[in-house]
Amino acid sequence: MTYESKTGNVKRFVKALQQEFDVEAIEITDDTIINQEFIHITYTIGFGEVPERTLSFINKNKNKIRGVAVSGNKVWGDNYGLAGDKLSAKFHTPLLLKFELSGTKQDLQKIIQEVQLIDKHNTKLDQAQ
């Protein structure tokens, strides 16, 4: 997994994932290049916008992205987690989860289930080739 956090909500979510499920996660920088498939976790800014660093990172690594998850705040109404919808549409990758602020235990379970489904699907594809 890769992630970007601004206020700390995404970072707290990722840290909880690491503690609960021992997953590997990399906080992206402007220069991050990924050599393996990944799921990216980010946040929504402004009125449903994608953070610029996330957009640039995924553009550079778009052939390896397998899904996105996004933090948001429901007080934004229709703009809640909208960055996830935008990333999903732009890069033709599934939106795996929208979670509020730093998420819940149920959100942690949900993202792990989604990752397992992706891994299972990729294993079947590898075996078919």
Swiss-Prot record:
Please give the InterPro entries that the UniProt record associates with this protein.
Flavoprotein-like_sf (IPR029039), RNR_Ib_NrdI_bac (IPR020852), RNR_NrdI (IPR004465)
GO molecular function: any one?
Answer: FMN binding
- Pfam families named among the record's database cross-references: Flavodoxin_NdrI
Any one of the GO BP annotations: protein modification process
Q: Record's NCBIfam families?
A: nrdI
The protein's job, in short, is:
Probably involved in ribonucleotide reductase function.
Q: Which family does it belong to?
A: Belongs to the NrdI family.
Q: What is this protein called?
A: SPbeta prophage-derived protein NrdI
Q: Which species is listed as the source? A: Bacillus subtilis (strain 168)
